Amino acid sequence: MAASLGGMFAGQPPGPPPPPPGLPGQASLLQAAPGAPRPSNSTLVDELESSFEACFASLVSQDYVNGTDQEEIRTGVDQCIQKFLDIARQTECFFLQKRLQLSVQKPDQVIKEDVSELRSELQRKDALVQKHLTKLRHWQQVLEDINVQHKKPADMPQGSLAYLEQASANIPAPLKQT
């Protein structure tokens, strides 16, 4: 897949970039130190990082802390955020184009990924259904217990007088002395 991403950023030669020293086989997305000026052939990722850093820099800049007009601060921050969003859209568009190329060149790979995603979604939903069934069984048992408790007192007559009558009926009659 690395070969299909060759030349993915503006100014980058086709093919995978050379690995940085000390990390064989891993491509580096950042080729310049953070905060350092970007080369003229910067990539979309470099520009995205730079605009992201600029968003934060505009928020913590000493110029803004030292009493700059609020409208000026708002305008500067809005411009930084808009630049970041524009570059993020360009980056997203690039990856969507690569995804489209991959789907044309290797449709079986896309189908495998879709099947894998669907399987994981089914497993997640099955687990959710089991969780709900467990809760349902619990509440059905609670309702059944409540119904059983309400049926037992219904067998007995209601009221204190009825209770006394029932209790006295079970007492044997006193024996007559002759």
Swiss-Prot record:
One MF term in the entry's GO annotations: actin binding
Region Disordered: start-end pairs: 1-43
Domain of life: Eukaryota
Biased composition, class Pro residues, residue ranges: 13-23
Assembly, per entry: Forms a ternary complex with NF2/merlin and GRB2. Binds to actin. Component of the Mediator complex, which is probably composed of MED1, MED4, MED6, MED7, MED8, MED9, MED10, MED11, MED12, MED13, MED13L, MED14, MED15, MED16, MED17, MED18, MED19, MED20, MED21, MED22, MED23, MED24, MED25, MED26, MED27, MED29, MED30, MED31, CCNC, CDK8 and CDC2L6/CDK11. The MED12, MED13, CCNC and CDK8 subunits form a distinct module termed the CDK8 module. Mediator containing the CDK8 module is less active than Mediator lacking this module in supporting transcriptional activation.
Protein purpose: May be part of a complex containing NF2/merlin that participates in cellular signaling to the actin cytoskeleton downstream of tyrosine kinase signaling pathways. Component of the Mediator complex, a coactivator involved in the regulated transcription of nearly all RNA polymerase II-dependent genes. Mediator functions as a bridge to convey information from gene-specific regulatory proteins to the basal RNA polymerase II transcription machinery.
UniProt name for this protein: Mediator of RNA polymerase II transcription subunit 28
